[in-house]
């Protein structure tokens, strides 16, 4: 489906859309687990296959639609960034996640309508001893040790928050390339012997269309090059100044002592012998260093792949040096090259991902506000989904995993999946409370048993799916796998323990029952 949508829209596969197939599988599997478990539960109650299939559509279908739509809206916020790659990711994810719902809600009942009725062996998993014992322990903790649950989750949140401050953005040109690959080893060789392979260029132009080849200007360029010598990250520069220095050495019988800027008179003589014209094959190199109008020149360096943080620091220091040497009213100086483009692109992509992730959290929260029109219910629904994100961010800070495009994506993916379990839990709980007119405790007891089983099955399946990513050769994909798995496991714990504990805390509130049973849109 995803490949078909990309083809219809004319989008090409990229780093981000490449993460959608496993994500769609995860969402589809989660939907299937909830639908099939409900089908087995209903069939075990009355033994009527048609009635069971009808009820999974009426009872689980609405919750599944709301879950998928909320997730799709969260991912769809990427469309509103100004980065084409993220726009495509937002459009494709929004369309395909909603399509997954229709495939599940139509395909699963239709398929099971042709299959034989479930056998006792097939529905035996509903009585799994280990899972039922675990859910029994969950209920015991929720009903008897709420304060202990609050204490552990508050402690976990505080501890994680302390490590969040260690988190920092950092990206390299060859960030996710395997360290053992031939490509990476070749890049290391060039970096060690040739000071890297990333072009770092400085373009100098005169404002008044004056001659760039004057002694005054070239002397400033020479001063800039000498100032940049203190940076071991830079290679030896290639510029018209280097050509002039070499020419000065040549006319002085190759004496190394004359490899320096000549005086103004000698410089004029040397420059007169260097006509700048692209048609002259002998001067093709010079035409790449100084333009034909003689109003601009280029200083070309190679720089090591030092990472976005160090590169940003170097850029700021170079900018200070440039401003000190070249008066802004006389010269226009610009840093360019692949390294500058990488830095700007990485900063822009990181900012877009960060803002899109933030807005996805906000929009999902607003969507939940339409589902649960009560401030307290929104807070109760959001808290169990924020804590896993803090735990993941704290874990990244503790282990020194930097923020980069491949890791920041974890927060949006994980939040979109964990919020599904929250919505499913609350909708099921409210249905139990309204239909049977039970107390909050009785409704929670039934909800934990009904939703808990599917939640455990789905989280185990999803985490196993993301765990496969850890076997990837690319570090970004590895991090995406184990970080998403960690977030989902923490989210499951929060939805099984913290969420019902907070709902139970509303039991004696004056308006609790009205808030909990208020009609869902």
What annotation goes with each model-predicted range?
Residues 178-191, 275-284, 315:
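A general structural motif
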């Amino acid at each position: 489906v995803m490949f078909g949508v990309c083809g219809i829209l004319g989008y090409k596969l990229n780093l981000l859309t490449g993460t959608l197939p496993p994500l769609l599988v995860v969402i589809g599997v989660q939907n299937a687990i909830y639908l099939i478990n409900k089908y087995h539960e209903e069939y075990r109650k009355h033994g009527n296959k048609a009635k069971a299939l009808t009820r999974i559509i009426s009872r689980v279908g609405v919750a599944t639609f709301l879950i998928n739509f909320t997730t799709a809206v969260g991912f769809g916020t990427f469309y509103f960034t100004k980065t084409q790659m993220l726009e495509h990711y937002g459009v494709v994810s929004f369309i395909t996640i909603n399509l997954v719902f229709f495939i599940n809600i139509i395909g699963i009942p239709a398929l099971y309508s042709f299959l034989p009725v479930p056998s006792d062996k097939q529905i035996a998993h509903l009585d799994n001893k280990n899972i039922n014992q675990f859910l029994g322990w969950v209920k015991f903790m929720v009903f008897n040790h709420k304060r202990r649950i609050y204490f552990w989750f508050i402690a976990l949140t505080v501890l994680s928050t302390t490590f969040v401050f260690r988190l920092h953005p950092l990206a390299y040109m060859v960030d996710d390339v395997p360290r053992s690959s031939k490509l990476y080893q070749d890049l290391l060789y060039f970096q060690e012997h040739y000071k890297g392979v990333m072009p770092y260029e400085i373009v100098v132009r005169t404002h008044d269309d004056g001659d760039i080849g004057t002694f005054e200007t070239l002397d400033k360029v020479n001063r800039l090059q000498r100032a940049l010598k203190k940076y071991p990250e830079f290679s030896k520069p290639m510029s018209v100044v280097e050509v002039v220095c070499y020419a000065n050495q040549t006319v002085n019988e190759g004496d190394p002592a004359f490899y320096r800027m000549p005086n103004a008179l000698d410089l004029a003589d040397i420059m007169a012998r260097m006509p700048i014209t692209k048609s002259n094959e002998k001067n093709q190199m010079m035409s790449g260093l100084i333009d034909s109008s003689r109003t601009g020149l280029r200083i070309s360096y190679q720089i090591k792949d030092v990472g976005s943080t160090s590169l940003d620091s170097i850029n700021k220091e170079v900018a200070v040096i440039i401003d000190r040497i070249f008066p802004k009213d006389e010269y226009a100086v610009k840093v360019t090259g692949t390294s500058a483009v990488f830095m700007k692109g990485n900063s822009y992509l990181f900012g877009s991902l960060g803002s899109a992730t933030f807005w996805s959290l906000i929009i999902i929260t607003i969507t939940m506000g339409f589902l649960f029109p009560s401030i307290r219910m929104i807070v109760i629904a959001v808290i169990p989904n924020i804590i896993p994100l803090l735990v993941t961010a704290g874990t990244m800070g503790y282990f020194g995993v930097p923020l980069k495009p491949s890791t920041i994506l974890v927060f949006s993916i994980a939040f979109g999946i964990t919020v599904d379990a929250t919505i499913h839990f609350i909708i099921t709980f409210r249905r139990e409370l309204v239909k049977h007119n039970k107390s909050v405790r009785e409704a929670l007891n039934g909800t934990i048993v009904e939703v808990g089983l599917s939640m455990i099955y789905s989280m185990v399946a999803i985490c196993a799916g993301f765990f496969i990513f850890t076997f990837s050769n690319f570090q970004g994909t590895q991090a995406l796998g184990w970080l998403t798995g960690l977030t989902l496991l923490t989210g499951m714990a929060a939805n099984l323990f913290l969420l019902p504990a907070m709902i139970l805390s509303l039991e004696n509130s004056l308006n609790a029952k009205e808030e909990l049973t208020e009609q869902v849109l």
